[in-house]
């Protein structure tokens, strides 16, 4: 997957289109990501030993990875990610707009 935990992403479709947020977790088997402050759902819970009080809890739900786009830390624009190899053999993620290295994979 092109997106990793801690990346800043932009939502490009759906009810939260245009919102930015950090990736909280990545679910590669389902091809989904959880972004903080985006796709908030209300979950009804019963009282348990951990949570003495039941009620309605708001939490972020996963989004399909095709609905988010990585924001390059160098040019601060949403971009696609290319994977290239350096001379020493390391694989890195590269911004397709400004050609800067985002980080190593």
From Swiss-Prot:
Superkingdom as given in the UniProt entry: Bacteria
GO term, biological process aspect, one: translation
Example of a GO cellular component annotation carried by this entry: cytosolic large ribosomal subunit
SUPFAM superfamilies per the UniProt record, alphabetical: Translation proteins SH3-like domain (SSF50104)
Keywords: Ribonucleoprotein, Ribosomal protein, RNA-binding, rRNA-binding
PROSITE patterns cross-referenced by the UniProt entry: RIBOSOMAL_L24
Transmembrane segments: none
Any one Gene Ontology molecular-function term assigned to this protein's record: structural constituent of ribosome
Pfam families: KOW, ribosomal_L24
Function, as annotated: One of two assembly initiator proteins, it binds directly to the 5'-end of the 23S rRNA, where it nucleates assembly of the 50S subunit.
PANTHER family tied to this protein: MITOCHONDRIAL RIBOSOMAL PROTEIN L24
NCBIfam families, sorted: rplX_bact
Family membership noted in the UniProt record: Belongs to the universal ribosomal protein uL24 family.
Self-association state and partner proteins as the record states: Part of the 50S ribosomal subunit.
Name of the featured protein: Large ribosomal subunit protein uL24
Native source species: Dictyoglomus turgidum (strain DSM 6724 / Z-1310)
